[in-house]
């Protein structure tokens, strides 16, 4: 998919946080603990959740699914087809994180990549983003897998 190691680590740090996972443990079958709306390692919600379930079904799967390959495939599909977006709540992160997908793919800073992914793909409210935890997970992933 052409992502730098730093951008990939930023994605992993976000997925670790979103799925309630810990190092070496991204939970593919995670369900949001508050209201059950978000599902999967990305915590797809609302319309995105409906589309994700349709994607699973079109590939012979149903929810819950532990098929990490399908979840990654769908996440990358979303990123390439309109879900890499700067919306109102993204602005709290700061304008410097409003990067194109191509710029993100080439990112060389783990912390920047983590914040950019959170702002443009996860799109959680800044005050609830837990960026310290996301960034710690991303830095852990980068240190563990760098140049492997």
Regions found by a protein language model. Name each.
Residues 91-93, 99-122, 128-137:
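Extracytoplasmic mature domains of secreted/periplasmic and thylakoid-lumen proteins
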Residues 1-61, 119-148:
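Cell-wall polysaccharide-cleaving catalytic domain and substrate-binding groove, primarily
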Residues 12-15, 72, 76, 114, ...:
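Non-transmembrane alpha-helical segments in soluble domains
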Residues 19-109:
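Peptidoglycan-targeting cell-wall enzymes and recognition modules
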């Amino acid at each position: 998919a052409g992502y730098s190691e730093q951008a990939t680590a930023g994605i992993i740090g976000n997925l670790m946080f979103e799925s309630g996972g810990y190092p070496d443990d991204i939970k593919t079958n995670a369900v949001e603990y508050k209201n059950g709306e978000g599902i999967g390692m990305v915590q797809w919600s609302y319309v995105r959740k409906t589309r994700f379930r349709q994607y699973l079904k079109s590939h012979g799967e149903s929810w819950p699914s532990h098929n990490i390959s399908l979840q990654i495939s769908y996440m990358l599909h979303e990123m390439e087809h309109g879900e890499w977006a700067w919306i109102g709540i993204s602005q709290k992160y700061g304008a410097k994180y409003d990067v194109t997908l191509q710029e993100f793919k080439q990112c060389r800073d783990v912390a920047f990549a983590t914040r950019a992914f959170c702002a443009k793909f996860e799109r959680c409210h800044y005050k609830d983003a837990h960026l310290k935890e996301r960034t710690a997970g991303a830095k852990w992933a980068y240190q563990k897998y760098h140049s492997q």
